[in-house]
A protein has these predicted regions:
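Short, small-residue-biased leader/transition segments that mark boundaries at the very start
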Residues: 1-6, 462
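Glycine-centered hinge/linker elements that transmit conformational signals in sensory
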Residues: 180-181, 228-267, 313
Length: 462
């Protein structure tokens, strides 16, 4: 079976070391597989050039796959065939899959290495929530990833209508409902309903999986965890009664407010994202990715143009803030060639270094992953839209919506949560999405049955 195939020695690098580059190039080749698009790959090429200049014994071969699922499936097949890249971009669910194949190298032995490792001071520079996601794969907290491109969710709102009626931007879900009830009494709402009967709400949530997990945790429940034997369990779906009850309370609440026409998800608008509905006036608040700010820009609306505001994800209780962190990490595979594996580690260490992380934060829509980058003069000027004149003086600029999103997103970092990852946890996300869709849009589906169905489906995958 697949397990037996997996157990074979994994040989890193599709090209055997030493014969990849011909006689004129005896550098050791590091293969890095990723799923970044063209614009991000350009930045990656710059990071690679820096690395090769500093490490003349190594060369990096960047191999791009169109999307994250293709990347995951290609690596899984490669592992089964006894080959793998030296290093790759990974989501937590991918990491747990590769661990089934015993193909990943723990980063702890390299981090703790006296020569090529990473000091405690250096490790402390990483934003805690991002750094913690590297150790969610077993009860021992073994590190299999370091953060690379990171984003979160935010609330975007129509700042013009908020200003017109003097509404405070809601920080809690109770306040969201207050705004929603006030909104339903406005002429704007009446006009929107006339134009889009049955498809107007105060707030739309993009990701139904994120909605389920985030609300479950805001209500004080645990979504998934490891049991006493280190096996992954689905607390909120059915494994732990106390967690199930709290999670169901969150979904029952969302359902009630949905029925009142206050809040919905992207499915209500017939789309995967609420951004078009938001720009069309079908909702005045939307929760979506911090990396997708430009899609929610009211200045790009086809009808009445408006200013988009950015704020934190609403909470049930501000004392127990819970916000998802999104995006990928970077991981190292076990190699039969020790020099290649060391090179892979050095490459990953370079990718998350101050210089590389600063470049990534300045040139992409993703967050700084480190405090020293966040607090740097370059990043602070970038985020404020300031221009540096030829004489070195700073000219105050105008902050873009994308920059506002980066700033507001990281301001929530104390609320970032991570969920443990194990074989089957990615399927749990799919089932979480299904629960929300069934409860809100399914024909006569009860909350209890939606949970039972999801739990039974999840157990098949363990």
């Amino acid at each position: 079976g697949l397990g037996d195939v997996y157990k074979r020695q994994v040989i890193c690098g599709v090209v055997a070391t030493g014969c990849g580059g011909g006689n004129d190039d005896d550098r050791i080749e590091i293969e890095y597989w990723h799923a970044n698009g063209a614009a991000l790959t350009t930045v990656l090429e710059e990071i690679k050039a820096d690395f090769e200049a500093k490490n003349p014994d190594y060369k990096v071969k960047l191999v791009s796959y169109g999307d994250y699922n293709t990347l995951r499936d290609t690596i899984t097949s490669a592992i089964a065939g006894g080959i793998a890249p030296t290093a790759a971009q990974t989501y937590p669910d991918h990491i747990s899959l590769y661990l089934e194949g015993e193909a990943l190298q723990s980063l702890d032995k390299y981090i703790n290495d006296p020569v090529n490792g990473m000091s405690k001071e250096e490790q402390a520079q990483f934003i805690e929530g991002f750094w913690a996601e590297g150790t969610i794969y077993d009860t021992a907290g073994t590190r299999y990833g370091m953060p690379f491109n990171k984003s979160t969710e935010l609330m975007y709102y129509n700042a013009d209508i908020f200003a017109k009626y003097g509404w405070e931007v809601p920080k809690t879900w109770d306040e969201v409902i207050e705004v929603a009830e006030a909104y339903k009494k406005t002429t704007e709402y009446a006009e929107a309903i006339k134009a889009n009967p049955g498809k107007v709400y105060a707030l739309g949530y993009d990701s139904e999986a994120n909605l389920f997990i985030t609300l479950t945790q805001q209500y004080g429940a645990v979504y998934t965890s490891f049991d006493a034997n280190g096996k992954g369990i689905y607390n909120a779906f059915g494994a732990v009664e106390a967690d199930v009850l709290k999670s169901k309370a969150s979904m029952n609440w969302y359902l009630e407010e949905f029925k009142k026409g206050n809040i919905a998800t992207s499915t209500a608008f017939g789309t995967d994202y609420c951004s078009d509905a938001f720009k069309a006036g079908q909702c005045i608040m939307t929760i979506g990715s911090s990396a997708g700010a430009t899609y929610n820009d009211g200045q790009a609306a086809t009808g009445v143009k408006f200013t988009t505001g950015v704020s934190a994800v609403p909470q049930k209780d501000l004392e127990n803030g819970q916000v998802i962190q999104q995006g990928t990490n970077v991981s190292l595979f076990k190699c039969s060639d020790a020099k290649e594996e060391l090179g892979g580690w050095l490459w990953l260490k370079h990718m998350v270094s101050y210089e590389s992380a600063l470049k990534w934060a300045l040139e992409t829509s993703y967050f700084p992953i480190r405090y020293d980058v966040l607090n740097s003069e370059e990043y602070q000027n970038h985020i404020k839209g300031n221009i540096i004149a030829d004489d070195g003086s700073v000219v105050e600029g105008i902050q873009t919506l994308a920059a506002k999103a980066k700033e507001a997103g990281l301001a929530q970092s104390q609320w970032f949560y991570t969920n443990v990852a194990f074989p089957g946890s990615s399927k749990a996300r799919d089932n979480a999405e299904t629960i929300v869709q069934q409860i809100l849009y399914g024909d006569s589906m009860t909350v209890d049955k939606a949970y039972t169905d999801a739990y039974n489906l999840s157990l098949i995958h363990i």
